[in-house]
Amino acid sequence: MKMDHILVRYGELALKGKNRGHFEKLLLANIRHVLKPFPKVQAKRTFGRIVVELNSTDHEPVAAALANVFGIQSYSLALRVENELEAMQKGALFMLTQHPDAKTFKVSARRAYKLFPIDSQSLNHKIGSYVLKAFTGELAVDVHHPDVNVVVDVRESGTYITAGVYAGAKGLPVGSSGKVLHLLSGGIDSPVAAHMLMGRGAEVEMLHFHSPPYTNERAKQKVIDLTRELTKFGRTITLHFVPFTDIQTHIHKEVPSSYEMTIMRRMMLRIADRIARERGILAISNGESLGQVASQTLASMNTINEMTNLPVLRPLLAMDKETTIAYAKRIGTYETSILPYEDCCTIFLPTDSKTKPKRDRSAHFEQYVQVEEKCREAIAGIESLEVTGAHTSPTLDQLF
């Protein structure tokens, strides 16, 4: 015998009423995306859950991939047997042998297939008695707090036997809450913010500003690698590279150093706003944390936000750096984030940035920056990639 299936249970999406079918289809598509490295594995939607058929594939890497998918409340390794009492008894016994340290157990039979002639209570008794006899005193029944709960789920297509529940990523399926344009730097914070948004069902498109030759190809590859790391949580991610050298050098030359960072951030948000509108995206997001640096004070955010009337989402707003670092380590982005390659936010870094920049002063300094011309040139030079877990490729629909 071999555990040949994984049963996937839904989280919040089960509460979505009339939209449940749409959410289930999204979750199934996201599951199939993360299972692409396993060509024999199939995922199907059936009887209120998703069943993953392993087809002789080792269950451990498949289960590890499923553990990252948002929208999964929990999952269980399962043995499928025919709808026959003897097969159920032997299957339950096999599943208990996978828990050698267990001292107590219970059997929980669920007879969804009502034409099966033995009712649930009788199944509990017949299967439990068989297991007790086989273990000859090594196991005891505990119906309240068992070490192992053997669930026998009788369906028309067969009986699925499980003996353990593993926590999923929970949340909502990526893509179920719409699309967000996320400003991705090469640092620790922004990948964490993107992950948090994905957990609430947002599909993220990444926007990165790079400034060659001040930022090199290794810095660019670092951003691709961070994006690729995030694809394991649901789906392919579109990544846009915006050429920012000309804008940045122009600002450095024409704007007082105390306002340099503010004007740079305003230009970034202007460009992000235009890209988002072009692509039908309803919100912009970033990895800012309140008070962390000069550009992330309330006054700075207020002045910078003037460049868009789209919502600017900041999932990390109230998180401290230590918490964010721990989060980055947990999701696997930390080691890439700390690679020592500069991004555009670390070059020409002024030491006297205003913590309370004014909107009118910012607008005054922007008169010397040729805002419209520079924005158009930057958008015209965008490079877009589709990033998957395996590779990247140019986007098929070139919008810029």
Curated annotation (Swiss-Prot):
Entry keyword annotation includes Manganese: no
Superkingdom assignment: Bacteria
Enzyme superclass (EC): transferase
Record InterPro entries: Rossmann-like_a/b/a_fold, ThiI_AANH, ThiI_fer, ThiI_N, THUMP_dom, THUMP_ThiI, tRNA_STrfase, tRNA_sulfurtransferase_ThiI
Main location: cytoplasm
Binding site for ATP: 183-184, 208-209, 265, 287, 296
Reactions catalysed according to its record: [ThiI sulfur-carrier protein]-S-sulfanyl-L-cysteine + a uridine in tRNA + 2 reduced [2Fe-2S]-[ferredoxin] + ATP + H(+) = [ThiI sulfur-carrier protein]-L-cysteine + a 4-thiouridine in tRNA + 2 oxidized [2Fe-2S]-[ferredoxin] + AMP + diphosphate; [ThiS sulfur-carrier protein]-C-terminal Gly-Gly-AMP + S-sulfanyl-L-cysteinyl-[cysteine desulfurase] + AH2 = [ThiS sulfur-carrier protein]-C-terminal-Gly-aminoethanethioate + L-cysteinyl-[cysteine desulfurase] + A + AMP + 2 H(+)
GO biological process: thiamine biosynthetic process; thiamine diphosphate biosynthetic process; thiazole biosynthetic process; tRNA 4-thiouridine biosynthesis
Compartments where located: Cytoplasm
Keywords annotated in UniProt: ATP-binding, Cytoplasm, Nucleotide-binding, RNA-binding, Thiamine biosynthesis, Transferase, tRNA-binding
Annotated metabolic or biological route of this protein: Cofactor biosynthesis; thiamine diphosphate biosynthesis
Gene3D superfamilies in UniProt: 3.30.2130.30, HUPs
Domain THUMP: 60-165
EC annotation from Swiss-Prot or TrEMBL: 2.8.1.4
GO MF, one annotated term: tRNA binding
Entries under PROSITE patterns matching the protein: THUMP
SUPFAM superfamilies reported for this sequence: Adenine nucleotide alpha hydrolases-like, THUMP domain-like
Gene Ontology cellular component list: cytosol
Its biological purpose: Catalyzes the ATP-dependent transfer of a sulfur to tRNA to produce 4-thiouridine in position 8 of tRNAs, which functions as a near-UV photosensor. Also catalyzes the transfer of sulfur to the sulfur carrier protein ThiS, forming ThiS-thiocarboxylate. This is a step in the synthesis of thiazole, in the thiamine biosynthesis pathway. The sulfur is donated as persulfide by IscS.
Family recorded in the similarity comment: Belongs to the ThiI family.
Name this polypeptide is given: Probable tRNA sulfurtransferase
Organism: Shouchella clausii (strain KSM-K16)
Source lineage: Bacteria, Bacillati, Bacillota, Bacilli, Bacillales
Encoding gene, per UniProt annotation: thiI
